[in-house]
Amino acid sequence: MKPNLIKQKMLRGECTTNGWLSLGSSYSAELMGHAGFDSVTVDCQHGMFDFNQALPMLQALSATPTVPIVRAPWNDTAIIMHLLDAGAYGVICPMINNRAEAERLVGACRYAPAGMRSYGPARGLLYGGADYFDHANDTIVTFAMIETLEGIKNLDDILATPGLDGIYIGPNDLALVLGARPGTDLTDQRCIDMIAHILARAKHFNKFAGIFCASGAVGAIRRVQGFDLVTLTHEGSLLSNAAKAAVAAALAPPPAGSEPKVSTGY
């Protein structure tokens, strides 16, 4: 089976960079897959697309060096199995509140006897290889999102779930339940302290810790803090910011001495 390079890298103690897809475009998926990210996540929760658009995005990612993973829309066993059959090599699952929900996530990603995943890998077999069944349970990576008060309360129970590879922090939803505003994960002390607590507990249980970051600069901060996977915003934000910067540069006075010379012909 094709190896899961981000899982191998995290097991070596190295931080991985993760891209994020929200626009529903296989072309943007292909571009992000060639941008240097260790993995790229197809966001089926808040992304502007459904499964029929997620499939060609996963196909596009499969032709790039990156590892294709997904954020499931919910902790729904059938949906998670479908996304794995489509070729996802990892699942980030939102709103995990307790151990039972974490066990449901893990069970959907593992074939018996470790779980309840139904056999029918389809694209997973094409992408992963003929020996997919033999290695899928050890290759697929699972992340439970910690972003609710109940999830915080039951954090240790969630982290103790057999087969769960790690937790993933959704900083905006986490900020909301802590009484803070979205986007304040680096400035509101309640968010700062809680993120540090979640990271420390993940390390205690020897689990991976991932987090969504608003930019590459924030990703660098999280990498130094010890996170194993840092998501460097999403392609919609990257496109918007680059477009705004290009317009601003075009309307700004050119630097002194950079005026184009007038051509006088051949």
Label every PLM stretch briefly.
Residues 1-266:
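Expand to "…catalyze enediolate/carbanion chemistry for C-C bond making/breaking, isomerization
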